[in-house]
Amino acid sequence: MAAAIQALLVLALLHLATATPVIGKQTVSTLSTGYLGHPVVGGLGYGGLGYGGLGVAGLGVAGLGYGGLGYPGAALGGVYTHHAAGLVHPYGGLGYHAAPYHHALGGLGYPLGIGAGVVAPHVVKGKIAAPLAPVVAAI
């Protein structure tokens, strides 16, 4: 199980490294489709690892992710993921151990917890999605 999770984390990091910002209702990821990254491929994209999508080893909630203003994500270990008006995302997910919510900067925003304390915030300014570099924090 640990090896499988490690492999998924490597895939997620590769995915983040190749993500391309786009405008409007197109992809914000090479592995996502739909408005602001609705997960469709193996739970990766902007769901899967941390919230939404299929999750890791089926721990997420299939069919849910972030499109439009966003939808509730995954429930993991009894911690429920919730979306509030596209601005604040209190949630529980794999690897996100910081504050219980994330404020968007200048519009829509949604963090992606990918395990082991690695957090990759994605911030939307206007209609342009701008993935930021992953931040490795001791949290």
UniProtKB/Swiss-Prot annotation:
Pfam family of the protein (one): Lamprin
Extent of the signal sequence: 1-19
Keyword ATP-binding tagged: no
One GO CC term, this protein: extracellular region
Alphabetically ordered keywords of this record: Extracellular matrix, Repeat, Secreted, Signal
Ranges for region 8 X 5 AA approximate repeats: 42-110
Sequence repeat boundaries on the chain: 42-46, 47-51, 52-56, 57-61, 62-66, 67-71, 92-96, 106-110
Localisation: Secreted, Extracellular space, Extracellular matrix
Any one Gene Ontology molecular-function term assigned to this protein's record: structural molecule activity
InterPro entries, per the entry: Lamprin (IPR009437)
Role this protein plays: Self-aggregating protein that is part of the soluble form of lamprin.
Subunit structure of this chain's protein: The polymeric lamprin chains self-aggregate to form fibers and have secondary structures particularly rich in beta-sheets and in beta-turns.
Record's protein name: Lamprin 0.9
Native organism: Petromyzon marinus (Sea lamprey)
